[in-house]
């Protein structure tokens, strides 16, 4: 794969997360009845970063949970069949019933991972609402799923791959588009 372009650098990611944190606070009139749930792997770290920013702004901690969704196939490459994401587990340290749950992921693409996450959340409890925050929306939805909070819209072709790198996992913060050779 060849790197085509860097879309967000460390500073741009920080700015996007700060803006999303402010949007969440404004939309929810504070964050008292909200729980952030990150989709493994990078969504968890983004959720934790958002919780830190919200706490800095509001002065109150935000509960952060995580959900592990594994794909039977590589959802970022060509589709080979109707295989679906598989929920491997959820670690949510609070009851989500009657809470606003904000699912956090790095890239929104087909929408299948988010749908699997929503199914898993409804199995755990009955949230009053489920919202979605993503760092990157690259389009190409296969399901009627739309993010409530978006760091950056990046129109891509299906042949391109959007890669999010976060310092907690990848030792650097960057979002880049790669082209398959």
Swiss-Prot record:
Annotated motif PRPP-binding, positions: 101-113
Family annotation (SUPFAM superfamilies): PRTase-like (SSF53271)
Primary enzyme class: transferase
Recorded catalytic activity of this chain's protein: UMP + diphosphate = 5-phospho-alpha-D-ribose 1-diphosphate + uracil
InterPro entries: PRibTrfase_dom (IPR000836), PRTase-like (IPR029057), PyrR (IPR023050), PyrR_bifunctional (IPR050137)
Catalytic activity, EC: 2.4.2.9
Keyword entries, A-Z: Glycosyltransferase, RNA-binding, Transcription, Transcription regulation, Transcription termination, Transferase
Secretion signal, residue range per the UniProt entry: none
An example Gene Ontology molecular-function term: uracil phosphoribosyltransferase activity
GO biological process, one term: DNA-templated transcription termination
Superkingdom per UniProt: Bacteria
Coiled-coil annotated residue ranges, if any: none
Oligomeric and partner information: Homodimer and homohexamer; in equilibrium.
Database matches in PANTHER family: BIFUNCTIONAL PROTEIN PYRR (PTHR11608:SF0)
Similarity comment text for this entry: Belongs to the purine/pyrimidine phosphoribosyltransferase family. PyrR subfamily.
Primary role: Regulates transcriptional attenuation of the pyrimidine nucleotide (pyr) operon by binding in a uridine-dependent manner to specific sites on pyr mRNA. This disrupts an antiterminator hairpin in the RNA and favors formation of a downstream transcription terminator, leading to a reduced expression of downstream genes.
Protein name: Bifunctional protein PyrR
Organism: Bacillus velezensis (strain DSM 23117 / BGSC 10A6 / LMG 26770 / FZB42) (Bacillus amyloliquefaciens subsp. plantarum)
Lineage, highest ranks first: Bacteria, Bacillati, Bacillota, Bacilli, Bacillales
